[in-house]
């Protein structure tokens, strides 16, 4: 079958959930037996989000091949079977960089390089490069229709239909139908204006996915259809749901997947949504609950920890329990102390991060978890701070810290990796992507994974300082996972504790609702046990 292309645009406001919509459509296509590819085009000029503040961009999602990408790719991987790559996310910065390099090589034979056709051709080439050997290529256009930054991308997808044929390209526009409480009614005008802007660019949407907090009445759908030049059946309600894993089910009930395959002239089997229904049922009707604190410095924007929070929910689904998340500002712990912060908490998790700010608050939280025998999970920087806390307060090593935060520390138990010492550029230069880890027999990590070899994704410059290994092990630290090629410590544990584990990698990037990551399943299980014993 010739590859079909589904382009998703958004209008009215940002953060409507285009990424979730794209992921849910991907899930529905796979449930019908189709092969899909997922891709996000971001209109910002940064080459990638790797150096952007989490407060501006949210989480940076890392792929197996080491790409630092938009958090929407996390949704794509959690909802579909796809393992994404560097081709799955590209930006204006990457497009212009590629075109300028070609111009310098002389690829354009002295021609004047312009947005049309050179930039738009480059965009189309990147779309095609990610759509090989699939039935449906789903492409999300970042930004909001009307933004000047998005224009080259919209022009490129406009050309796509002309070149590939109307029957092979579908435009789906996600828009907002707000309810105005004072008027007591839904308003369609924002959707009308958003579609008007899209049509002025030359794109007539085929399906309107209308985000709303309630069902849109039939007469209002008819009004939207009339003013936006689509059939009434093409106006689909995207109602708010309690659980984001309910979105594919809600879309199917609205007939969205049927509209898509009808338009693209694809014959498929009926979708099997049994697994999604099971997940939603477990989410809504848990047998028990547990409370876990995430201690970090980006907690004002919880999107900074999107994959992390979802992985904990996956752990809850596996344990048939509700996971209540409490976000704790590590800087606040530095200023005010731990106090009663963790009084009703069953597990403490310290995630990755960068910079000195808030580090002592994380160390205080780790000490509380260790001394009070509360299950603790440290990820990336969280593992490194667990090593610092153990070295200081158990092994009695003075002036002990990470050289990232104190270059002249007498005892840098965490230090910069050898191959990072001469690196001066920030973007794309960390240890990124999937690397193997060998697990030690008889350890907690080995029991959790049930195997001796695993592969996990990384994003870091600093590592455990092996010069302190013997001293820390004598104090009771267990090194349970190692990347043997270079002797890099990947997992640490401590003896005589219900559940205390830190890992250098980011397991949250490989967790899915149908396949919870073993570490999160085990950590949530330990927290649930602590809740029962409290």
Swiss-Prot record:
InterPro entries per UniProt: Class_I_gatase-like (IPR029062), CTP_synthase (IPR004468), CTP_synthase_N (IPR017456), GATASE (IPR017926), GATase1_CTP_Synthase (IPR033828), P-loop_NTPase (IPR027417)
Domain Glutamine amidotransferase type-1 positions: 291-533
Binding site for ATP: 15-20, 72, 239-241
Activity control note: Allosterically activated by GTP, when glutamine is the substrate; GTP has no effect on the reaction when ammonia is the substrate. The allosteric effector GTP functions by stabilizing the protein conformation that binds the tetrahedral intermediate(s) formed during glutamine hydrolysis. Inhibited by the product CTP, via allosteric rather than competitive inhibition.
UniProt-listed Enzyme Commission number(s): 6.3.4.2
Coiled coil location: none
The keyword Ligase appears for this protein: yes
GO CC field: cytosol
Active-site residues from the entry: 380, 506, 508
Catalytic activity: UTP + L-glutamine + ATP + H2O = CTP + L-glutamate + ADP + phosphate + 2 H(+); L-glutamine + H2O = L-glutamate + NH4(+); UTP + NH4(+) + ATP = CTP + ADP + phosphate + 2 H(+)
Stretches for region Amidoligase domain: 1-266
Binding site for L-glutamine: 353, 381-384, 404, 461
Keywords from the named record: ATP-binding, Glutamine amidotransferase, Ligase, Magnesium, Metal-binding, Nucleotide-binding, Pyrimidine biosynthesis
GO MF: ATP binding; CTP synthase activity; glutaminase activity; identical protein binding; metal ion binding
Function: Catalyzes the ATP-dependent amination of UTP to CTP with either L-glutamine or ammonia as the source of nitrogen. Regulates intracellular CTP levels through interactions with the four ribonucleotide triphosphates.
PANTHER family referenced in this protein's UniProt entry, alphabetically: CTP SYNTHASE (PTHR11550), CTP SYNTHASE-RELATED (PTHR11550:SF0)
HAMAP family in the cross-refs: PyrG
Name of the protein this chain belongs to: CTP synthase
Organism: Syntrophotalea carbinolica (strain DSM 2380 / NBRC 103641 / GraBd1) (Pelobacter carbinolicus)
């Amino acid at each position: 079958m010739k590859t079909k292309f589904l382009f998703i645009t958004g209008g009215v406001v940002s953060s409507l959930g285009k990424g979730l919509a794209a992921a849910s459509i991907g899930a529905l296509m796979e449930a019908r037996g189709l092969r899909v590819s997922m891709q996000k085009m971001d209109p910002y000029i940064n080459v990638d989000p790797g150096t952007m503040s989490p407060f501006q961009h949210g989480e940076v999602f890392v792929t197996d091949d080491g790409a630092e990408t938009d958090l929407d790719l996390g949704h794509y991987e959690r909802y579909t079977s796809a393992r994404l790559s560097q081709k799955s996310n590209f930006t204006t910065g990457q497009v212009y960089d590629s075109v300028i390099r070609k111009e310098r090589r002389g690829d354009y034979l002295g021609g004047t390089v312009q947005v049309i056709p050179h930039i738009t051709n480059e965009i189309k080439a990147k779309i095609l490069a990610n759509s090989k050997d699939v039935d449906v290529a789903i492409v999300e256009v970042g930004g909001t229709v009307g933004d000047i930054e998005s224009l080259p991308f919209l022009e490129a997808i406009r050309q796509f239909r002309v070149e590939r044929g109307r029957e092979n390209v579908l435009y789906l526009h996600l828009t907002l139908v707000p309810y105005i409480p004072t008027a007591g009614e839904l308003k369609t005008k924002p959707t009308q204006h958003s579609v008007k802007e899209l049509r002025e660019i030359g794109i007539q949407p085929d399906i309107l996915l209308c985000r709303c907090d309630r069902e849109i009445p039939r007469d209002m759908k008819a009004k939207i259809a009339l003013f936006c030049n689509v059939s009434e059946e093409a106006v689909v309600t995207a109602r708010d749901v309690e659980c984001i894993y309910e979105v594919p089910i809600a879309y199917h009930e609205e007939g969205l997947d049927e509209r898509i395959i009808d338009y693209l002239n694809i014959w498929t089997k009926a979708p099997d949504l049994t697994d999604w229904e099971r997940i939603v049922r477990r989410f809504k009707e848990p047998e028990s609950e547990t409370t876990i604190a995430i201690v970090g410095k980006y907690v004002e924007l919880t999107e900074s920890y999107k994959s992390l929070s979802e992985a904990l929910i996956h752990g809850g689904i596996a344990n048939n329990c509700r996971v209540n998340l409490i976000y704790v500002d590590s800087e606040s712990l530095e200023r005010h102390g731990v106090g009663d912060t963790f009084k009703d908490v069953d597990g403490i998790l310290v995630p990755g991060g960068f910079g000195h700010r808030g580090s002592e608050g994380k160390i205080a939280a780790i000490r509380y978890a260790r001394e009070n025998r509360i299950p603790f999970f440290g990820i990336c920087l969280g593992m490194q701070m667990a090593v610092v806390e153990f070295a200081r307060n158990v092994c009695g090593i003075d002036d002990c810290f990470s050289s990232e935060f104190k270059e002249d520390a007498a005892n840098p138990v965490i230090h910069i990796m050898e191959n990072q010492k001469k690196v001066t550029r920030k973007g794309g230069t960390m240890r990124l992507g999937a690397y193997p880890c060998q697990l030690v027999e008889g350890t907690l990590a080995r029991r959790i994974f049930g195997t001796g070899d695993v592969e996990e994704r990384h994003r870091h410059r600093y590592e455990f300082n092996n010069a302190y290994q013997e001293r820390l092990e004598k104090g009771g630290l267990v090194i349970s996972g190692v990347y043997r090629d270079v002797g890099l410590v990947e997992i640490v544990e401590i003896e005589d504790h219900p559940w205390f584990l830190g890992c250098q990698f980011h397991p949250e990037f490989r967790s899915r609702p149908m396949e919870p990551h073993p570490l999160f399943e085990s950590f949530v299980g330990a927290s649930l046990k602590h809740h029962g014993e409290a």
